[in-house]
Amino acid sequence: MRVSALAFAAVLSLVSAKKINMHCNFAEDHTGMVQQPYCCRDLVPARGNSKANEALDCDQLDQPQLCDDQSRPACCYTIGAKKICTSHVIFQDAEDV
């Protein structure tokens, strides 16, 4: 019985260690800019661009994760100090890619 429990624990750890990728599409505000994943705390609607939000207080992500407030990261491109965000990160199972 003990061997079965150890085998089950090993299988369970392999399943929970699944590799996840995150991906950002090109900007959806007709600029076609390449976007990167950010967690932004001050997103507001962009002036003159109904398909985007803008922010200054952002942290760029390099690992798949949720933001501190458990929200999905935004996909943004930069113009000067501003981040222009037009969509959200897409999380995918690495085996699907």
Swiss-Prot record:
Aerial growth, conidiation, and dispersal of filamentous fungi in the environment rely upon a capability of their secreting small amphipathic proteins called hydrophobins (HPBs) with low sequence identity. Class I can self-assemble into an outermost layer of rodlet bundles on aerial cell surfaces, conferring cellular hydrophobicity that supports fungal growth, development and dispersal; whereas Class II form highly ordered films at water-air interfaces through intermolecular interactions but contribute nothing to the rodlet structure. Residues 1-17 form the signal peptide. It comes from Penicillium expansum. Disruption phenotype: Affects hydrophobicity only when HfbC, HfbD and HfbE are also deleted. Disruption of all 7 hydrophobins leads to altered germination kinetics, decreased survival under exposure to extreme cold stress and increased mycotoxins patulin and citrinin production. Disulfide bonds join 24-75, 39-67, 40-58, 76-85. The keyword Disulfide bond applies. It is found in: Secreted; Secreted, Cell wall. This is Unclassified hydrophobin F. The keyword Signal applies.
